[in-house]
Amino acid sequence: METAEGPHLVRLYVYDMSRGLARRLSPVMLGKQLEGIWHTSIIVFDEEFFYGREGITSCLPGRTMLGEPDSVMELGITEVTEEIFLEYLSSLGESGFSGESYHLFDHNCNTFSNEVAQFLTGKKIPSYITELPSEVLSTPLGQALRPLLDSVQIQPAGGNIFNRQSGPS
Protein backbone atom coordinates (compact mmCIF):
# COMPACT_ATOMS: atom_id res chain seq x y z
CA MET A 1 0.00 0.00 0.00
CA GLU A 2 1.38 3.40 -0.95
CA THR A 3 1.81 6.03 1.73
CA ALA A 4 0.31 9.51 1.53
CA GLU A 5 3.76 11.11 1.28
CA GLY A 6 6.76 10.46 -0.91
CA PRO A 7 7.07 9.64 -4.58
CA HIS A 8 4.29 7.64 -6.21
CA LEU A 9 4.54 5.68 -9.43
CA VAL A 10 2.09 6.79 -12.15
CA ARG A 11 1.12 4.24 -14.79
CA LEU A 12 -1.10 4.30 -17.85
CA TYR A 13 -3.30 1.28 -18.53
CA VAL A 14 -4.11 0.88 -22.22
CA TYR A 15 -7.00 -1.32 -23.35
CA ASP A 16 -7.87 -2.20 -26.95
CA MET A 17 -11.65 -1.88 -27.05
CA SER A 18 -11.70 -3.74 -30.38
CA ARG A 19 -9.89 -6.78 -28.94
CA GLY A 20 -7.63 -6.91 -32.00
CA LEU A 21 -10.31 -6.36 -34.64
CA ALA A 22 -9.10 -2.84 -35.48
CA ARG A 23 -5.68 -4.20 -36.43
CA ARG A 24 -7.22 -6.79 -38.77
CA LEU A 25 -10.13 -4.84 -40.25
CA SER A 26 -8.98 -1.21 -40.39
CA PRO A 27 -6.94 -1.52 -43.62
CA VAL A 28 -10.00 -2.82 -45.49
CA MET A 29 -12.62 -0.65 -43.79
CA LEU A 30 -10.71 2.61 -43.34
CA GLY A 31 -7.92 2.32 -45.87
CA LYS A 32 -5.31 2.78 -43.12
CA GLN A 33 -3.83 0.66 -40.39
CA LEU A 34 -5.05 1.17 -36.82
CA GLU A 35 -3.46 -0.93 -34.11
CA GLY A 36 -6.42 -0.64 -31.75
CA ILE A 37 -9.32 1.41 -30.43
CA TRP A 38 -7.83 2.71 -27.20
CA HIS A 39 -9.34 3.19 -23.76
CA THR A 40 -6.91 4.46 -21.13
CA SER A 41 -6.83 5.00 -17.40
CA ILE A 42 -4.35 6.35 -14.86
CA ILE A 43 -3.09 4.18 -12.02
CA VAL A 44 -1.80 5.96 -8.93
CA PHE A 45 -2.28 5.48 -5.17
CA ASP A 46 -3.25 1.82 -5.77
CA GLU A 47 -6.34 2.92 -7.70
CA GLU A 48 -7.36 3.00 -11.39
CA PHE A 49 -8.94 6.31 -12.47
CA PHE A 50 -10.83 6.73 -15.74
CA TYR A 51 -13.48 8.85 -17.44
CA GLY A 52 -16.66 8.02 -19.31
CA ARG A 53 -20.35 8.85 -19.51
CA GLU A 54 -20.68 8.58 -15.71
CA GLY A 55 -17.88 11.08 -15.16
CA ILE A 56 -14.64 10.31 -13.34
CA THR A 57 -14.62 6.84 -11.83
CA SER A 58 -12.15 4.68 -9.95
CA CYS A 59 -11.68 1.05 -8.98
CA LEU A 60 -8.92 -1.33 -8.02
CA PRO A 61 -6.40 -1.65 -10.86
CA GLY A 62 -7.53 -4.10 -13.54
CA ARG A 63 -11.03 -4.48 -12.04
CA THR A 64 -13.08 -2.77 -14.75
CA MET A 65 -15.23 -4.92 -17.00
CA LEU A 66 -12.35 -4.66 -19.49
CA GLY A 67 -10.22 -6.92 -17.31
CA GLU A 68 -6.47 -6.70 -17.54
CA PRO A 69 -4.98 -3.98 -19.77
CA ASP A 70 -3.37 -4.80 -23.10
CA SER A 71 -0.34 -2.75 -22.09
CA VAL A 72 0.96 -0.84 -19.10
CA MET A 73 3.22 2.20 -19.44
CA GLU A 74 5.14 3.82 -16.62
CA LEU A 75 4.61 7.57 -17.00
CA GLY A 76 6.88 8.60 -14.17
CA ILE A 77 6.84 9.56 -10.52
CA THR A 78 4.68 12.15 -8.79
CA GLU A 79 5.20 14.02 -5.55
CA VAL A 80 1.53 15.06 -5.52
CA THR A 81 -0.18 13.75 -2.38
CA GLU A 82 -3.28 11.60 -2.56
CA GLU A 83 -5.30 14.33 -0.81
CA ILE A 84 -4.32 16.97 -3.37
CA PHE A 85 -4.93 14.52 -6.21
CA LEU A 86 -8.45 13.71 -4.99
CA GLU A 87 -9.21 17.44 -4.68
CA TYR A 88 -7.93 17.90 -8.24
CA LEU A 89 -10.19 15.08 -9.50
CA SER A 90 -13.15 16.60 -7.72
CA SER A 91 -12.51 19.95 -9.40
CA LEU A 92 -12.16 18.23 -12.79
CA GLY A 93 -15.50 16.53 -12.23
CA GLU A 94 -17.11 19.89 -11.54
CA SER A 95 -15.54 21.66 -14.49
CA GLY A 96 -14.76 19.77 -17.68
CA PHE A 97 -15.11 16.09 -16.86
CA SER A 98 -18.71 15.58 -15.83
CA GLY A 99 -20.58 12.73 -17.49
CA GLU A 100 -22.47 15.21 -19.65
CA SER A 101 -19.17 16.51 -21.07
CA TYR A 102 -18.15 13.11 -22.45
CA HIS A 103 -17.80 12.88 -26.23
CA LEU A 104 -16.32 9.86 -28.01
CA PHE A 105 -14.12 11.86 -30.39
CA ASP A 106 -13.51 15.19 -28.69
CA HIS A 107 -13.54 14.70 -24.91
CA ASN A 108 -13.04 11.11 -23.81
CA CYS A 109 -11.10 8.78 -21.53
CA ASN A 110 -7.87 9.57 -23.37
CA THR A 111 -8.40 13.32 -22.95
CA PHE A 112 -8.80 12.67 -19.23
CA SER A 113 -5.75 10.40 -18.99
CA ASN A 114 -3.64 12.94 -20.86
CA GLU A 115 -4.68 15.81 -18.60
CA VAL A 116 -4.19 13.82 -15.39
CA ALA A 117 -0.80 12.49 -16.58
CA GLN A 118 0.36 16.06 -17.17
CA PHE A 119 -0.88 17.15 -13.74
CA LEU A 120 0.90 14.29 -11.98
CA THR A 121 4.11 13.95 -14.02
CA GLY A 122 4.31 16.84 -16.48
CA LYS A 123 4.23 14.29 -19.33
CA LYS A 124 1.61 13.57 -21.97
CA ILE A 125 0.34 10.13 -22.90
CA PRO A 126 1.51 8.77 -26.30
CA SER A 127 0.22 10.63 -29.34
CA TYR A 128 -0.87 7.45 -31.13
CA ILE A 129 -3.60 7.26 -28.46
CA THR A 130 -4.67 10.91 -28.41
CA GLU A 131 -4.61 11.22 -32.21
CA LEU A 132 -6.79 8.14 -32.85
CA PRO A 133 -10.07 10.08 -33.25
CA SER A 134 -8.60 12.34 -35.94
CA GLU A 135 -7.11 9.28 -37.67
CA VAL A 136 -10.54 7.65 -37.87
CA LEU A 137 -12.32 10.86 -38.87
CA SER A 138 -9.80 11.52 -41.64
CA THR A 139 -11.24 8.58 -43.59
CA PRO A 140 -14.41 8.60 -45.73
CA LEU A 141 -15.96 5.82 -43.60
CA GLY A 142 -15.09 7.68 -40.40
CA GLN A 143 -16.85 10.78 -41.72
CA ALA A 144 -19.86 8.74 -42.84
CA LEU A 145 -20.14 7.00 -39.46
CA ARG A 146 -19.53 10.10 -37.33
CA PRO A 147 -23.23 10.83 -36.66
CA LEU A 148 -23.71 7.27 -35.38
CA LEU A 149 -20.43 7.20 -33.47
CA ASP A 150 -21.17 10.58 -31.86
CA SER A 151 -23.96 8.88 -29.90
CA VAL A 152 -21.66 6.19 -28.47
CA GLN A 153 -20.79 6.61 -24.80
CA ILE A 154 -18.29 4.32 -23.13
CA GLN A 155 -18.15 3.61 -19.41
CA PRO A 156 -16.34 0.51 -18.19
CA ALA A 157 -17.99 -0.65 -14.99
CA GLY A 158 -15.83 0.43 -12.11
CA GLY A 159 -16.42 1.44 -8.55
CA ASN A 160 -16.24 4.92 -7.11
CA ILE A 161 -17.71 7.85 -9.01
CA PHE A 162 -16.36 11.35 -8.38
CA ASN A 163 -18.89 14.15 -8.52
CA ARG A 164 -19.69 17.54 -7.09
CA GLN A 165 -21.90 16.37 -4.29
CA SER A 166 -19.90 13.71 -2.51
CA GLY A 167 -16.46 13.09 -3.98
CA PRO A 168 -15.66 9.36 -4.14
CA SER A 169 -18.66 7.16 -3.39
Curated annotation (Swiss-Prot):
GO cellular component: cytoplasm; nucleus
Main location: cytoplasm
InterPro entries: PPPDE_dom, PPPDE_sf
Location within or outside the cell: Cytoplasm; Nucleus
Keywords: Cytoplasm, Hydrolase, Nucleus, Protease
Catalysis performed (reactions): S-hexadecanoyl-L-cysteinyl-[protein] + H2O = L-cysteinyl-[protein] + hexadecanoate + H(+)
Cysteine disulfide partners in this protein: none
EC assignment: 3.4.-.-, 3.1.2.22
Motif (Nuclear export signal 2): 140-154
PROSITE patterns, per the entry: PPPDE (PS51858)
Domain of life where this protein originates: Eukaryota
Motif mapping: Nuclear export signal 1: 84-92
Function: Protease which deconjugates SUMO1, SUMO2 and SUMO3 from some substrate proteins. Has isopeptidase but not SUMO-processing activity. Collaborates with ubqln4 in the export of ubiquitinated proteins from the nucleus to the cytoplasm. Exhibits palmitoyl protein thioesterase (S-depalmitoylation) activity towards synthetic substrates 4-methylumbelliferyl-6-S-palmitoyl-beta-D-glucopyranoside and S-depalmitoylation probe 5 (DPP-5).
Binding partners and assembly: Homodimer.
Family: Belongs to the DeSI family.
Official protein name in the record: Desumoylating isopeptidase 1
Organism: Xenopus laevis
Lineage, opening ranks: Eukaryota, Metazoa, Chordata, Craniata, Vertebrata
